[in-house]
């Protein structure tokens, strides 16, 4: 009998039957305990992986001149956008957790370019535009869904809907959805946070600029979803200002608060 570890024959004996039942219950309990241990170890490995992602994101920010809450904000922006697009809950969570690594390729860009106070010149922009491919190389190719989505975001978040982006000049639907989502999230973050060569603008000001680039830089469907959650984006921005206090206790994989 497939899967059988014991069986009872007739005529039935009460003591033997009781012993066999007890044996089967013990086996069931052992199996459940083993399953619980496997689940616990899986959760521990998952948390370790998230901690490594957060640590790498922090290292990237240190190199750019100090820790901010940018990757936390962007993670929540991605969560909000994914939900507004109607993606499944697990997919939204996956993309949000993968988001901190989207700019990891900047670790391969010369430090004097990353920390330059003035606008970059053409030669420096050429170096800066290498960071999506560098990021994809750093993350590598994995079967793991989280790292796979992180690689896609890192590689494609500077592609443009009209095909004039970089590094591959992908156009329209050829750009993976995670990259299209991150393009909007990253643009909003860049416009509403303090930059070395420009001051931040308001959430509504950023929304107007993003809407103006719908169909050019950004996927119109994602822009439409973004416009529905601009208020929530602004709440995230206000809630996670760039303050050093408590930054090490932040959960970069937490779902966006509404």
Residue ranges and their predicted role:
Residues 2, 31, 45, 182-185:
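Residue-level recognition of hydrophobic positions within alpha-helical transmembrane segments
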Residues 19, 24-54, 58, 62-65:
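Amphipathic alpha-helical coiled-coil "transmission" helices that mediate dimerization
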Residues 57, 61-258:
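Metal-dependent catalytic cores of enzymes that make or break cyclic nucleotides
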Residues 1-32, 241:
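N-terminal membrane insertion elements
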Residues 9, 42, 192:
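Ser/Thr-centric signal marking residues that sit
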